């Protein structure tokens, strides 16, 4: 009886009832008054987007969510480098929600999917080069096109020629 009392929260919900509810349907987390880390982890395992309803996010809960669905990074209140790297590994497009991008994180994203160059805040020639090597069409997002970057893009996909700036197109065609 004493142990049972300890498990009850303000609204009279027992921990076991709450756990069972979120195991059945993660959406029920929105109605759990006294959320524990265990209950929140269960909900996020069931549906990573339940992170939206977690009142007190911990790094463990956030990592669990982004490992399953990188785009849930959008709902992480306090991003850490570890959370961001897990999110980008799961889905390179999660880079769009990274508040403090690092060179390494951007490089990892574009190597996995060159089109994520669109979300790189500070482009470098190396990041752009890696992006177009993965997808020639990433050239459309390159802010500072160099001959080397354009050539790599066209090597990867001849149709990337469409995105070479007109002033550079003639020079590029001469070198082919």
Q: Language-model features: where?
A:
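Alpha-helical scaffold segments
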Residues: 1-176
